[in-house]
Amino acid sequence: MESIPISVEGFRRLERELERLKKERPGVILAIKEAREEGDLRENAGYEAARERQGMLEARINYIESRMSRFNVIDLATLGGEQVIFGATVEIEDVDTGDVKKYTLLGPDEAEPSKGSISLLSPVGLALLGKFVGDEIVVDAPRGKINYEIVSIAFHGPIAAADD
């Protein structure tokens, strides 16, 4: 089994989510029991909604639990260097348009593109890994191939925790 990189903060966030989901379980089971007591289950929207919620809850619990044992927890405060690795914040410039983007490379379970972090397994993340300032990368995008130049690589320690 291959290990999955995750920051200490990302791991803690998933631990909190797992704990919260497990605390929700009894309430969902009770909702199913109460809906079942209402009679005919074929036309019982409350029962169907509770069963659907239970299915989603159990699926997420199982997913997190199965990943936990595979995580390689990395303290971002210990990282540094001149090469793009997990935890690096990289500034890239589109060679054709001059547009500049900044991303922090994180594991697939904690990446949030809307907050500036991407998975190191994403097309951009994979293209950046192992590169240095001044290197150019090519990313296949829906609008075609995009050439980027790496402008800067920085390591900032722990990332700000996202709202749960």
Curated annotation (Swiss-Prot):
GO molecular function terms attached to this record: DNA binding; RNA polymerase binding
Keyword Transcription belongs to the record: yes
Coiled-coil intervals, chain numbering: 12-38
One Pfam assignment: GreA_GreB
Role of this protein: Necessary for efficient RNA polymerase transcription elongation past template-encoded arresting sites. The arresting sites in DNA have the property of trapping a certain fraction of elongating RNA polymerases that pass through, resulting in locked ternary complexes. Cleavage of the nascent transcript by cleavage factors such as GreA or GreB allows the resumption of elongation from the new 3'terminus. GreA releases sequences of 2 to 3 nucleotides.
NCBIfam families listed in its UniProt record: greA (TIGR01462), PRK00226.1-2 (NF001261), PRK00226.1-4 (NF001263)
Protein name, UniProt field: Transcription elongation factor GreA
Source organism of this protein record: Solidesulfovibrio magneticus (strain ATCC 700980 / DSM 13731 / RS-1)
